[in-house]
Amino acid sequence: MKKLFVICLALVLVMGFTACESTSQLSESETASIDSNNTAETEDMTTMKMSVTIGDQSFNATLEDNAATRELVKMMGEEPISINMDDYSGFEKVGSLGRSLTTDNKQITTQPGDIVLYSGNQIVMFYGSNSWSYTRIGKIDDLSGWEDALGNGSVTAVFSLVE
């Protein structure tokens, strides 16, 4: 009777370990699939561009790969985003996005052409430099005419995806 109990217990343990092992292998396979999907998404984001139109001038910007930018891309995929932007301190234009995005703020020193998220719901475009805690959105590729387009006072900027 004791031998039968030990044999049954051994069979249950072997079957249990086998089930755990196959589940583990399945999880590794699923993980590899998820990783490859995330890599494809990341590769797409590192080459994704948006257009910033101010008046009759358009500028292309290379986008960062972060949660805020992915959320912004989703918004732009639905329709272009138009933001009224005011001058602030003679080095940036600031405007409300109308909703909050996920932030990943880091202390950075901006340069002309940088586009960042401030306070989760403010888009800031720089034509000067500033040090503050921002979430990077993107950077204008060619600054020719950038400062002139931003000019003095308020502007309306239209953000859209580049196809």
Can you describe what each PLM-predicted range is?
Residues 24-49:
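N-terminal, intrinsically disordered, polar/charged segments of Gram-positive cell-envelope systems
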Residues 6-13:
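Sec-dependent N-terminal signal peptides
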Residues 138-163:
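Well-ordered alpha/beta subsegment
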Residues 68-119:
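Mature extracytoplasmic domains of secretory-pathway proteins
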Residues 15-19:
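C-terminal motif of bacterial Sec signal peptides marking the signal peptidase cleavage site
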Residues 1-4:
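Positively charged n-region of N-terminal signal peptides that target proteins for export
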Residues 55-62:
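Second-shell loop/turn segments in exported
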Residues 127-142:
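Short, compositionally biased
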